[in-house]
Protein backbone atom coordinates (compact mmCIF):
# COMPACT_ATOMS: atom_id res chain seq x y z
CA UNK A 1 0.00 0.00 0.00
CA UNK A 2 1.54 3.25 -1.09
CA UNK A 3 1.04 6.62 0.48
CA UNK A 4 -1.52 7.75 -2.03
CA UNK A 5 -3.57 4.57 -1.70
CA UNK A 6 -3.91 4.39 2.05
CA UNK A 7 -7.45 3.97 3.32
CA UNK A 8 -6.47 4.87 6.85
CA UNK A 9 -7.56 8.37 7.73
CA UNK A 10 -3.98 9.43 8.20
CA UNK A 11 -3.98 13.15 8.67
CA UNK A 12 -2.09 15.35 11.12
CA UNK A 13 -2.49 15.08 14.84
CA UNK A 14 -4.49 18.02 16.16
CA UNK A 15 -3.54 17.44 19.81
CA UNK A 16 -7.04 18.36 21.01
CA UNK A 17 -8.19 14.95 22.15
CA UNK A 18 -10.27 15.66 25.24
CA UNK A 19 -13.58 14.88 23.54
CA UNK A 20 -12.85 11.70 21.59
CA UNK A 21 -11.04 8.42 22.09
CA UNK A 22 -12.52 6.06 19.50
CA UNK A 23 -12.86 5.61 15.77
CA UNK A 24 -16.11 6.74 14.17
CA UNK A 25 -16.69 5.45 10.66
CA UNK A 26 -19.86 7.43 9.95
CA UNK A 27 -19.86 9.43 6.65
CA UNK A 28 -19.84 12.81 8.35
CA UNK A 29 -17.17 11.94 10.88
CA UNK A 30 -14.08 13.39 9.31
CA UNK A 31 -15.80 16.48 7.98
CA UNK A 32 -17.18 17.47 11.37
CA UNK A 33 -14.09 16.46 13.30
CA UNK A 34 -11.73 18.36 11.06
CA UNK A 35 -13.77 21.51 11.69
CA UNK A 36 -13.48 21.07 15.46
CA UNK A 37 -9.77 20.26 15.48
CA UNK A 38 -7.38 23.19 15.56
CA UNK A 39 -3.83 22.31 14.55
CA UNK A 40 -0.85 24.35 15.71
CA UNK A 41 1.55 22.44 13.46
CA UNK A 42 4.79 24.25 12.73
CA UNK A 43 3.95 23.98 9.06
CA UNK A 44 0.49 25.48 9.61
CA UNK A 45 1.27 28.66 11.57
CA UNK A 46 1.23 30.81 8.45
CA UNK A 47 -2.34 29.77 7.70
CA UNK A 48 -3.51 31.06 11.10
CA UNK A 49 -1.92 34.40 10.28
CA UNK A 50 -3.98 34.80 7.13
CA UNK A 51 -7.24 34.09 8.92
CA UNK A 52 -6.69 36.21 12.01
CA UNK A 53 -5.16 39.45 10.71
CA UNK A 54 -7.90 41.91 9.96
CA UNK A 55 -7.89 45.03 7.78
CA UNK A 56 -7.45 47.39 10.75
CA UNK A 57 -3.69 46.92 10.93
CA UNK A 58 -0.86 44.73 12.14
CA UNK A 59 -1.36 45.57 15.81
CA UNK A 60 -4.94 44.34 15.91
CA UNK A 61 -3.96 41.29 13.88
CA UNK A 62 -1.16 40.47 16.30
CA UNK A 63 -3.55 40.74 19.24
CA UNK A 64 -6.01 38.42 17.53
CA UNK A 65 -3.27 35.88 16.86
CA UNK A 66 -2.10 36.03 20.47
CA UNK A 67 -5.65 35.50 21.75
CA UNK A 68 -6.09 32.59 19.37
CA UNK A 69 -2.91 30.92 20.65
CA UNK A 70 -4.03 31.38 24.26
CA UNK A 71 -7.43 29.81 23.56
CA UNK A 72 -5.96 26.86 21.69
CA UNK A 73 -3.28 26.31 24.32
CA UNK A 74 -5.99 25.46 26.83
CA UNK A 75 -7.17 22.56 24.64
CA UNK A 76 -3.77 21.14 23.65
CA UNK A 77 -2.79 17.74 24.95
CA UNK A 78 0.60 16.06 24.75
CA UNK A 79 -0.23 12.40 24.26
CA UNK A 80 1.33 9.51 26.13
CA UNK A 81 1.60 7.34 23.03
CA UNK A 82 0.66 6.89 19.39
CA UNK A 83 0.29 3.44 17.82
CA UNK A 84 1.50 3.12 14.23
CA UNK A 85 -0.10 0.13 12.54
CA UNK A 86 -1.00 -1.47 9.23
CA UNK A 87 -4.30 -0.62 7.60
CA UNK A 88 -5.68 -4.09 8.29
CA UNK A 89 -4.71 -3.91 11.97
CA UNK A 90 -6.97 -1.06 13.04
CA UNK A 91 -9.07 -3.28 15.31
CA UNK A 92 -6.00 -4.79 16.93
CA UNK A 93 -4.50 -1.33 17.41
CA UNK A 94 -7.71 -0.21 19.13
CA UNK A 95 -7.57 -3.23 21.41
CA UNK A 96 -3.97 -2.43 22.40
CA UNK A 97 -4.88 1.22 22.92
CA UNK A 98 -7.69 0.26 25.29
CA UNK A 99 -5.42 -2.23 27.04
CA UNK A 100 -2.79 0.40 27.80
CA UNK A 101 -5.31 3.05 28.79
CA UNK A 102 -7.78 1.00 30.81
CA UNK A 103 -5.60 -1.71 32.36
CA UNK A 104 -2.39 0.27 32.88
CA UNK A 105 -3.69 3.85 33.09
CA UNK A 106 -1.40 5.09 30.31
CA UNK A 107 -3.44 7.85 28.72
CA UNK A 108 -4.25 9.71 26.66
CA UNK A 109 -3.14 7.66 23.67
CA UNK A 110 -4.20 7.37 20.05
CA UNK A 111 -3.89 5.07 17.08
CA UNK A 112 -2.90 6.26 13.63
CA UNK A 113 -6.37 5.61 12.17
CA UNK A 114 -8.00 7.97 14.69
CA UNK A 115 -6.28 11.09 13.46
CA UNK A 116 -8.52 13.77 11.97
CA UNK A 117 -8.43 14.26 8.23
CA UNK A 118 -7.04 17.30 6.44
CA UNK A 119 -3.28 16.87 5.99
CA UNK A 120 -0.85 14.78 4.03
CA UNK A 121 0.73 11.60 5.37
CA UNK A 122 4.16 13.07 6.12
CA UNK A 123 2.79 16.00 8.10
CA UNK A 124 0.48 13.62 9.90
CA UNK A 125 3.36 11.33 10.86
CA UNK A 126 5.49 14.25 12.04
CA UNK A 127 2.70 15.59 14.25
CA UNK A 128 1.94 12.13 15.64
CA UNK A 129 5.52 11.27 16.58
CA UNK A 130 6.42 14.69 17.98
CA UNK A 131 3.06 15.17 19.68
CA UNK A 132 3.44 12.09 21.87
CA UNK A 133 5.99 10.70 24.30
CA UNK A 134 6.19 7.18 22.87
CA UNK A 135 5.73 5.74 19.39
CA UNK A 136 4.46 2.15 19.44
CA UNK A 137 5.03 0.06 16.31
CA UNK A 138 2.44 -2.71 16.11
CA UNK A 139 4.47 -5.62 14.72
CA UNK A 140 2.11 -8.00 12.94
CA UNK A 141 2.29 -10.02 9.75
CA UNK A 142 0.49 -7.14 8.03
CA UNK A 143 3.12 -4.64 9.12
CA UNK A 144 5.79 -5.92 6.72
CA UNK A 145 3.36 -6.02 3.80
CA UNK A 146 2.56 -2.33 4.20
CA UNK A 147 5.09 -0.06 2.49
CA UNK A 148 3.83 2.94 4.44
CA UNK A 149 4.45 1.10 7.72
CA UNK A 150 8.04 0.42 6.72
CA UNK A 151 8.52 4.12 6.06
CA UNK A 152 6.89 4.96 9.38
CA UNK A 153 9.23 2.87 11.48
CA UNK A 154 12.38 4.07 9.70
CA UNK A 155 11.28 7.69 10.11
CA UNK A 156 10.42 7.15 13.78
CA UNK A 157 13.80 5.58 14.46
CA UNK A 158 15.65 8.44 12.77
CA UNK A 159 13.65 10.94 14.80
CA UNK A 160 14.59 9.19 18.04
CA UNK A 161 18.26 9.26 17.04
CA UNK A 162 18.36 12.90 15.97
CA UNK A 163 16.46 14.28 18.97
CA UNK A 164 18.05 13.61 22.33
CA UNK A 165 14.82 13.79 24.33
CA UNK A 166 13.26 11.22 21.96
CA UNK A 167 15.89 8.59 22.71
CA UNK A 168 14.29 5.20 23.44
CA UNK A 169 10.86 6.58 22.54
CA UNK A 170 10.20 4.03 19.77
CA UNK A 171 8.62 0.85 21.18
CA UNK A 172 8.10 -2.20 18.93
CA UNK A 173 5.25 -4.37 20.19
CA UNK A 174 4.15 -7.88 19.25
CA UNK A 175 0.45 -8.14 20.08
CA UNK A 176 -1.42 -11.33 20.90
CA UNK A 177 -3.09 -11.56 17.50
CA UNK A 178 -1.04 -12.27 14.39
CA UNK A 179 2.34 -11.19 15.82
CA UNK A 180 5.36 -10.83 13.53
CA UNK A 181 7.93 -13.59 14.27
CA UNK A 182 11.24 -12.38 15.66
CA UNK A 183 13.20 -13.93 12.81
CA UNK A 184 11.23 -11.87 10.29
CA UNK A 185 11.51 -8.61 12.17
CA UNK A 186 13.54 -5.94 10.32
CA UNK A 187 17.11 -5.76 11.58
CA UNK A 188 16.74 -2.12 12.65
CA UNK A 189 13.99 -3.18 15.07
CA UNK A 190 15.75 -6.29 16.34
CA UNK A 191 18.16 -4.05 18.25
CA UNK A 192 15.28 -2.70 20.37
CA UNK A 193 13.65 -4.72 23.14
CA UNK A 194 10.09 -5.25 22.00
CA UNK A 195 6.99 -5.41 24.14
CA UNK A 196 5.73 -9.00 24.06
CA UNK A 197 2.07 -9.12 25.02
CA UNK A 198 2.07 -12.90 25.40
CA UNK A 199 5.02 -12.78 27.80
CA UNK A 200 4.48 -13.16 31.54
CA UNK A 201 6.69 -10.17 32.05
CA UNK A 202 4.53 -7.91 29.89
CA UNK A 203 3.09 -5.88 32.82
CA UNK A 204 6.60 -5.31 34.17
CA UNK A 205 7.81 -4.24 30.73
CA UNK A 206 4.99 -1.72 30.45
CA UNK A 207 5.68 -0.21 33.87
CA UNK A 208 9.40 0.05 33.15
CA UNK A 209 8.96 1.73 29.77
CA UNK A 210 6.08 4.14 30.29
CA UNK A 211 7.44 6.15 33.20
CA UNK A 212 5.69 9.35 34.21
CA UNK A 213 9.00 11.18 34.69
CA UNK A 214 9.94 10.54 31.06
CA UNK A 215 6.55 11.76 29.91
CA UNK A 216 6.83 14.96 31.97
CA UNK A 217 10.28 15.70 30.54
CA UNK A 218 9.09 15.33 26.96
CA UNK A 219 5.92 17.29 27.69
CA UNK A 220 7.96 20.20 29.04
CA UNK A 221 10.20 20.27 25.97
CA UNK A 222 7.15 20.08 23.72
CA UNK A 223 5.50 23.04 25.46
CA UNK A 224 8.68 25.12 25.40
CA UNK A 225 9.15 24.47 21.70
CA UNK A 226 5.60 25.46 20.85
CA UNK A 227 5.73 28.57 23.04
CA UNK A 228 8.95 29.66 21.36
CA UNK A 229 7.39 29.30 17.92
CA UNK A 230 4.32 31.26 19.03
CA UNK A 231 6.44 34.10 20.45
CA UNK A 232 8.49 34.31 17.26
CA UNK A 233 5.35 34.39 15.17
CA UNK A 234 3.62 37.08 17.26
CA UNK A 235 6.78 39.22 17.25
Curated annotation (Swiss-Prot):
Full protein name: TIR domain-containing adapter molecule 2
Annotated transmembrane regions: none
GO molecular-function terms, A-Z: molecular adaptor activity; signaling adaptor activity
Taxonomic lineage from the root: Eukaryota, Metazoa, Chordata, Craniata, Vertebrata
Subunit structure: Homodimer. Interacts with TLR4, TICAM1, IRF3 and IRF7 in response to LPS. Interacts with IL1R1, IL1RAP, IRAK2, IRAK3 and TRAF6. Interacts with protein kinase-inactive mutants of IRAK1 and IRAK4. Isoform 1 interacts with isoform 2; the interaction occurs in late endosomes and disrupts the interaction between isoform 1 and TICAM1. Interacts with MYD88; the interaction decreases after IL-18 stimulation in a time-dependent manner. Interacts with IL18R1 and IL18RAP. Interacts with TLR2. Interacts with RAB11FIP2.
Domain TIR: 73-229
Disulphide bridges: none
Resulting phenotype, residue 16 to E: Significant decrease of localization in the membrane
Gene that this polypeptide is encoded by: TICAM2
Effect of residue 116 to H: Loss of ability to dimerize. Significant loss of RANTES-inducing activity. Loss of ability to induce NF-kappa-B activation
Amino acid sequence: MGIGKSKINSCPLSLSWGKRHSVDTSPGYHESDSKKSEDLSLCNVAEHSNTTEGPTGKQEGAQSVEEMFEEEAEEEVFLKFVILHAEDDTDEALRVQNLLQDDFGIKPGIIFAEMPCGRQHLQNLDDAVNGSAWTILLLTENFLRDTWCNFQFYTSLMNSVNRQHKYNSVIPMRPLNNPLPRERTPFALQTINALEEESRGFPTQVERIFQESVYKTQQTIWKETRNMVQRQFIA
